[in-house]
Amino acid sequence: MRLPIFLDTDPGIDDAVAIAAAIFAPELDLQLMTTVAGNVSVEKTTRNALQLLHFWNAEIPLAQGAAVPLVRAPRDAASVHGESGMAGYDFVEHNRKPLGIPALLAIRDALMRAPEPVTLVAIGPLTNIALLLSQCPECKPYIRRLVIMGGSAGRGNCTPNAEFNIAADPEAAACVFRSGIEIVMCGLDVTNQAILTPDYLSTLPQLNRTGKMLHALFSHYRSGSMQSGLRMHDLCAIAWLVRPDLFTLKPCFVAVETQGEFTSGTTVVDIDGCLGKPANVQVALDLDVKGFQQWVAEVLALAS
């Protein structure tokens, strides 16, 4: 039986790969997509998500979400993904539009209609998820678990300690981590290992139309290089759903720093139990890199 999922995203070049896997992995049933401001503005992430759905002729409803963090001024990652968020490929024109309700209500309504609890996957800042949990607490029993790409047990990628998706809205992440729902965190500890090699990248133009499109996007992606390999951060959240055997997880207490002058956005991961607090997150700490690369090749071959 396919696993029903809702995907909250901020495309973003590596988001595009994760969306492809969510659509084409035969084990998954992608039922709803929502967008959030993150890599670029929410208007751009929504446009990019609609372009991808049209490219794959995927009839999946999409709702636009939060334009700004809960408290802070927005920050973006245009230096990594380009000003549009998906520079490098000319998508054809289309007339698709997002749903007429915001992401918060789209997720709430879809959860309440679902015949069984649904897995939420968040690969951008956690603003939409925090709004859902705080404004619609009646939805909690309908959430099977939340799988996120975000955080780190060690160093960061936008500050010395903080990973971008958490740092973009620390207050939202803190709300989510305190919520009591089951959380799997695929952070930089594994995503920095999730590298597509130059040899594989060079085969993409011959793979299929998705390979050609991704190869064009990758030429503008700044999380690594085509010569040294590219890190597929967001794809790890989808990979865990399909191949959890590739990941080493440890239950840990995780808190989000929201006050520190130099540490705001840091996920404080208590690996050794020093704080004596109960674990609230399953933290991915290691990855079978070869197995991950093989799985990526298999799923992208299906993305025609």
From Swiss-Prot:
It holds the Pfam family IU_nuc_hydro. PROSITE patterns: IUNH (PS01247). InterPro entries: I/U_nuclsd_hydro_CS, Inosine/uridine_hydrolase_dom, IUNH, Nucleosid_hydro_RihC_nonspecif, Ribo_hydro-like. GO terms for molecular function: purine nucleosidase activity; uridine nucleosidase activity. The active site is at 233. Gene3D superfamilies: Ribonucleoside hydrolase-like. Its EC number is 3.2.-.-. One of its GO terms (biological process) is pyrimidine nucleobase metabolic process. The keyword Mitochondrion does not apply. GO terms for cellular component: cytosol. It is an enzyme of class 3 (hydrolase). Keywords: Glycosidase, Hydrolase. Belongs to the IUNH family. RihC subfamily. Hydrolyzes both purine and pyrimidine ribonucleosides with a broad-substrate specificity. This is Non-specific ribonucleoside hydrolase RihC. It comes from Escherichia coli (strain SE11).
